[in-house]
C-alpha cells in the first residue's frame, strides 16, 4: 500500500466482511472511502483504472469492517493525573484498540461536575485527541454524594451521561433525585453499584481465595444490594439507569428480571469480568486488583450468558490507568484498576470464537448499543459521511505486550498472553487515526 | 533431605517432608538453649535483618534470640507506620537494605502477601514473620513442635482452633501445617469470625464450643482483638466470653490429656480464663520456648546459603 502524507484518504477494501448490527448488516462487500468520505458499501465496486491509481486497494478477505468502536467507560485521567494518562495518550490507545469514541468518567481532578471541566475536556480532545471524547458528568458535586451537580449545564456543555463512578451514590434519596432530575435532560444515570458498608476494607472477591490469602473480601452482595436499590429507583422514577461494570451472577439475574418487567435499565460489563476468575490473585499480583473485584467461575459464566441473551447490552473496558507508584506496592495500598483499550478487542472476539456471541452481537456490544444507551447517533456505518470505522482481522495472532501500548500506563493483567484479533486500521472523522498496515 | 527453598513464606507451599525436616532440626537445636553457653558458631558472619512493619515483641525477640544463638549479626528495624506514610516505598527500603548485603530478612507486615512481594525483589532469603491475615508459618511450626512433644505424633490428632479465625494468620498456617501432617482441624467460633467458605481449606467448622471440647486433643485459643466489636462482628466481649471463652468449667468435658495452647498475647478473662491459661493442661509457655528452637532451625536452613 502506498500512501504519501499529501495523498487524500482514498481506500478501496475488497471483499471485507462488513458487520453493522445497527442496520442488521453482515455481508461480504467492497468498501469505498473517497477523500475520507465513506462513499459506498456493495458487493463489487469497479473503478476505472486511472481512478484506481489514486486509491489504496486492500484485499480485505477474511477481515472485518465494523463501525468505529465505542467504549462507554474509560478513565482518561486528564485533568489532574496526567502522569497516568492524558486525553492525547488515552485516545491514541483507543484508536490503536479500534475505538473511535470513548466516554470518560468524571473522577478527574478537578471532578467533572461543571461546564468548565466538561468544556476543558472537549477542548483538549479537539486539540490533541485522536478520537471522539464523550465526557460524563458527575452525579454529585465533587463526587461527594451530598448535592446534585448541575446536570443541565453539564449536558449543555457536552456531557453525555452522569455518574459518580468510582464511588457509589450511597444516599438513596440523592440517587432518586439524580434519576428524576436526569430524566429532565434525558441523561442516563450510570450506577457504580456498590454498597460501601458491605465492601468496606475489601480488597478482592469474598470467597475461598480471599480466605486462603487472608485478604479482606468484598461479597457479591455489595454489588447486588445496590443493583436492587437502583432498579427499584429506576422503576419508581422511570428514568434511564445504566449499571456499570456488572461483575456478579446475581446482578445479571436482577437486571434481566427488571428488563423483562420493562424497567428502563441497561448494563455493561468489562472484558476482565468474563475472562478472569479470582484465583488469579493467588500470587498477590496487584494487576488483578480492580473494583468491582474479579469474581468466581459461576459469575463469569453468568456474565457470558447475560451478554448472549442481551441482559448485558455493552462491553466497556473501564480503562483505569495507574502508574507503578499506585500499583507496585503492598496489595492493600495498591490502587484498583486495569487498562483495557488495547486489550479489549481480542478478548471480546474470543467470545465469538467460543460461540458465546455471534460476530454481529459482539460488534453491537461495542458500537450501536453503547451509542443507543448514550443517546448518540454513532456506532453505525453512515454513507456519505466522514469515515468512522474499524478494519480488523479477527484471527490476527499476537502476544499481548503492554510495553508497546500507547497508553501511558502498564497495568494490564493480560500482558504476555497469546491472543487473536486486532484492529488493523481505525478511521476517525475521515482520517486514518491509526494503522498497523505497513506503509 | 536438604531444604532447597530460598524463602519461607508460608506452610501452604511446604510439603510434609519439608515440615518434618524443620521440626526435627528444631528438636535437635532446642538443646542449645539449655546449655550454660547458649551459642554456636553456625551463622557466624551472616547478617539477619528484622524488618517489622507491625508492633511485635514476642516474635521479634524470639527471632533475634534465635539468630544470636547461631552467632548471626542482627539488626532490627521496627516501625508501626506503613512504608507509604514514611514517603519511601517498602521496595525502596528493601533495596537499600539489600545493598548492605544481608543474608536473611525476617519480615512482619500488616498487609497479606507482602513477604511474597519482597521475596521476588531480593536475593536474600525472606522469612515471613506474619503477614496480615495470611500466614505466620514459624508460629504454626512452633505450635506443631509443642504438640509433638506432648502427643508424640500429629497424625490422627484432633485440633480445635477457637476464636477469631477470620483475621488469624496463625490459624491459616496451622490449618495448612496440621492438615498436611494428618491432623483433623475443627474451627470454632461465631459465624462472624469464621472466614467465608472455610471448609474449602479441608477443615470442619463448628459454632458450638460445648460440642467440640470433648472431641479435641488440642484446643488452640486465639486472641480476640477488641476492635472486632467496633467492626460489628460481636455485640460485646462479655457475650463472647460467655459463649466462646475457654473456662475451667467448660473444660470439665474435655479429654483427660487435652492440651491448651495460645499464640499470645492473652486477653485473660475474654477468650481464656486465668485458671485455664495457667492450669495443668496449658502449654502456652512451652510454645514460647519452642519458638526460639523453630526459628533457629529456619535461620539455619535459610541463612547458610
Swiss-Prot record, chain A:
UniProt keyword list: Hydrolase, Metal-binding, Pyrimidine biosynthesis, Zinc
Coiled-coil regions, chain positions: none
MF terms (GO), sorted A to Z: allantoinase activity; dihydroorotase activity; zinc ion binding
Residues the entry annotates as binding Zn(2+) 2: 165, 192, 245
Designated name of the protein: Dihydroorotase
Catalyses which reaction(s): (S)-dihydroorotate + H2O = N-carbamoyl-L-aspartate + H(+)
Lineage top rank: taxon: Bacteria
Taxonomic classification: Bacteria, Pseudomonadati, Thermodesulfobacteriota, Syntrophobacteria, Syntrophobacterales
Cysteines paired by S-S bonds: none
CDD domains, A to Z: DHOase_IIa
InterPro entries: Amidohydro-rel (IPR006680), DHOase (IPR004722), DHOase/Allantoinase_Hydrolase (IPR050138), Dihydroorotase_CS (IPR002195), Metal-dep_hydrolase_composite (IPR011059), Metal_Hydrolase (IPR032466)
GO cellular component: cytoplasm
Pfam families associated with the record: Amidohydro_1
Binding site for Zn(2+) 1: 73, 75, 165, 318
Active site: 318
Pathway, per record: Pyrimidine metabolism; UMP biosynthesis via de novo pathway; (S)-dihydroorotate from bicarbonate: step 3/3
Family recorded in the similarity comment: Belongs to the metallo-dependent hydrolases superfamily. DHOase family. Class I DHOase subfamily.
Enzyme class: hydrolase
Cofactor needs: Zn(2+)
A biological-process GO annotation: 'de novo' UMP biosynthetic process
Cofactor binding mode and count: Binds 2 Zn(2+) ions per subunit.
Gene name as annotated: pyrC
UniProt entry tagged with the keyword Membrane: no
This enzyme's EC code(s): 3.5.2.3
Curated annotation (Swiss-Prot), chain B:
Leader peptide range in chain numbering: none
InterPro entries per UniProt: Asp/Orn_carbamoyltranf_P-bd, Asp/Orn_carbamoylTrfase, Asp/Orn_carbamoylTrfase_sf, Asp_carbamoyltransf, Asp_carbamoyltransf_Asp/Orn-bd
A GO CC term attached to the entry: cytosol
Pfam family, one: OTCace
Keywords: Pyrimidine biosynthesis, Transferase
Chain positions recorded as L-aspartate binding sites: 86, 169, 223
Binding annotation for carbamoyl phosphate: 58-59, 108, 136, 139, 264-265
Catalytic activity: carbamoyl phosphate + L-aspartate = N-carbamoyl-L-aspartate + phosphate + H(+)
Family annotation (HAMAP family): Asp_carb_tr
Reported function: Catalyzes the condensation of carbamoyl phosphate and aspartate to form carbamoyl aspartate and inorganic phosphate, the committed step in the de novo pyrimidine nucleotide biosynthesis pathway.
Family the entry assigns: Belongs to the aspartate/ornithine carbamoyltransferase superfamily. ATCase family.
Subunit structure: Heterododecamer (2C3:3R2) of six catalytic PyrB chains organized as two trimers (C3), and six regulatory PyrI chains organized as three dimers (R2).
Protein name: Aspartate carbamoyltransferase catalytic subunit
Source organism per UniProt: Syntrophobacter fumaroxidans (strain DSM 10017 / MPOB)
Phylogenetic placement of the source organism: Bacteria, Pseudomonadati, Thermodesulfobacteriota, Syntrophobacteria, Syntrophobacterales
Amino acid at each position: 500500500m502506498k500512501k504519501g502524507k499529501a495523498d487524500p484518504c482514498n481506500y478501496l477494501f475488497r471483499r471485507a466482511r462488513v458487520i453493522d448490527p445497527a442496520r442488521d448488516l453482515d455481508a461480504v462487500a467492497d468498501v469505498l472511502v473517497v477523500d475520507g468520505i465513506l462513499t459506498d458499501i456493495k458487493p463489487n465496486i469497479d473503478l476505472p483504472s486511472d481512478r484506481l491509481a489514486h486509491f489504496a486497494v486492500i484485499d480485505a478477505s477474511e477481515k472485518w469492517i465494523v463501525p468505529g468502536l465505542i467504549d462507554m467507560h474509560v478513565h482518561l485521567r486528564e485533568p489532574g493525573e496526567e502522569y497516568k494518562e492524558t486525553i492525547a495518550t488515552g485516545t491514541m490507545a483507543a484508536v490503536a484498540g479500534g475505538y473511535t469514541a470513548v466516554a470518560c468518567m468524571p473522577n478527574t481532578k478537578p471532578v467533572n461536575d461543571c461546564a468548565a471541566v466538561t468544556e476543558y475536556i472537549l477542548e483538549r480532545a479537539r486539540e490533541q485527541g485522536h478520537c471522539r471524547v464523550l465526557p460524563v458528568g458527575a452525579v454529585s458535586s465533587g463526587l461527594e454524594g451530598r448535592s446534585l451537580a448541575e446536570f443541565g449545564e453539564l449536558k449543555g456543555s457536552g456531557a453525555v451521561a452522569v455518574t459518580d463512578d468510582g464511588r457509589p451514590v450511597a444516599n438513596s434519596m440523592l440517587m432518586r433525585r439524580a434519576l428524576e432530575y436526569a430524566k429532565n435532560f434525558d441523561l442516563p444515570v450510570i450506577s457504580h453499584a456498590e454498597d460501601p458498608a458491605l465492601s468496606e476494607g475489601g480488597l478482592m472477591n469474598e470467597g475461598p481465595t480471599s480466605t486462603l490469602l487472608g485478604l479482606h473480601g468484598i461479597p457479591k452482595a455489595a454489588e447486588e444490594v445496590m443493583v436492587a436499590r437502583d432498579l427499584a429507583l429506576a422503576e419508581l422514577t422511570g428514568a434511564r439507569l445504566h449499571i456499570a461494570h456488572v461483575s456478579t451472577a446475581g446482578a445479571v439475574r436482577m437486571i434481566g428480571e427488571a428488563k423483562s418487567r420493562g424497567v428502563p435499565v441497561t448494563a455493561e460489563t468489562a472484558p476482565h469480568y468474563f475472562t478472569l476468575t479470582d484465583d488469579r490473585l493467588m500470587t498477590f499480583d496487584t494487576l488483578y486488583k480492580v473494583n468491582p473485584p474479579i469474581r468466581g467461575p459461576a459469575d463469569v459464566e453468568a456474565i457470558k450468558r447475560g451478554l448472549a441473551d442481551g441482559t448485558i447490552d455493552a462491553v466497556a473496558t473501564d480503562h483505569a490507568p495507574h502508574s507503578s507508584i499506585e500499583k507496585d506496592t503492598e496489595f492493600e495500598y495498591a490502587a484498583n484498576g486495569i487498562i483495557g483499550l488495547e486489550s479489549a478487542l481480542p478478548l471480546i472476539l474470543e467470545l465469538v470464537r467460543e460461540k458465546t456471541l455471534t460476530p454481529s452481537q459482539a460488534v453491537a456490544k461495542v458500537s450501536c448499543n453503547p451509542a443507543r444507551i448514550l443517546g448518540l447517533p454513532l456506532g453505525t456505518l453512515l454513507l456519505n459521511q466522514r469515515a468512522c470505522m474499524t478494519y480488523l482481522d479477527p484471527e490476527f495472532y499476537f502476544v499481548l505486550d503492554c510495553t508497546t501500548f500507547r497508553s501511558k500506563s502498564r497495568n494490564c493483567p493480560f500482558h504476555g498472553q497469546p491472543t487473536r484479533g486486532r484492529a488493523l486500521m481505525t478511521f476517525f472523522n475521515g482520517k486514518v487515526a491509526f494503522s498497523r498496515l505497513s506503509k | 533431605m536438604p531444604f532447597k527453598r530460598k524463602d519461607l513464606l508460608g506452610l501452604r507451599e511446604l510439603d510434609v517432608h519439608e515440615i518434618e525436616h524443620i521440626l526435627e532440626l528444631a528438636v535437635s537445636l532446642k538443646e542449645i538453649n539449655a546449655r550454660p553457653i547458649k551459642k554456636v558458631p553456625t551463622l557466624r558472619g551472616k547478617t539477619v535483618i528484622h524488618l517489622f512493619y507491625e508492633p511485635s515483641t514476642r516474635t521479634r525477640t524470639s527471632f533475634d534470640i534465635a539468630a544470636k544463638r547461631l552467632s548471626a549479626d542482627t539488626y532490627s528495624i521496627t516501625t508501626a507506620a506503613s512504608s507509604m506514610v514514611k514517603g519511601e516505598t517498602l521496595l525502596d527500603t528493601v533495596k537499600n537494605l539489600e545493598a548492605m548485603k544481608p543474608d536473611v530478612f525476617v519480615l512482619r507486615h500488616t498487609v497479606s502477601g507482602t513477604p511474597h512481594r519482597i521475596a521476588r525483589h531480593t536475593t536474600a532469603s525472606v522469612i515471613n514473620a506474619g503477614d496480615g491475615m495470611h500466614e505466620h508459618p514459624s508460629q504454626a511450626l512452633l505450635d506443631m513442635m509443642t504438640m509433638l512433644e506432648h502427643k508424640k505424633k500429629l497424625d490422627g490428632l484432633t485440633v480445635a482452633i477457637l476464636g477469631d479465625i477470620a483475621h488469624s494468620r496463625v490459624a491459616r498456617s496451622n490449618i495448612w501445617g496440621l492438615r498436611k501432617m494428618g491432623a483433623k482441624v475443627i474451627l470454632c467460633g461465631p459465624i462472624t469470625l469464621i472466614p467465608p467458605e472455610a471448609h474449602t481449606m479441608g477443615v470442619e467448622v463448628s459454632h458450638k464450643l460445648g460440642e467440640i471440647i470433648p472431641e479435641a486433643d488440642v484446643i488452640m485459643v486465639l486472641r480476640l482483638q477488641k476492635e472486632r466489636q467496633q467492626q460489628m462482628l460481636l455485640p460485646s466481649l462479655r457475650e463472647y466470653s460467655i459463649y466462646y471463652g475457654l473456662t475451667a468449667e467448660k473444660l470439665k468435658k474435655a479429654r483427660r490429656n487435652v492440651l491448651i495452647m495460645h499464640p499470645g498475647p492473652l486477653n485473660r478473662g475474654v477468650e481464656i480464663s486465668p485458671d485455664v491459661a495457667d492450669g495443668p493442661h496449658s502449654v502456652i509457655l512451652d510454645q514460647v520456648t519452642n519458638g526460639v528452637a523453630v526459628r533457629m532451625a529456619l535461620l539455619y536452613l535459610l541463612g547458610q546459603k
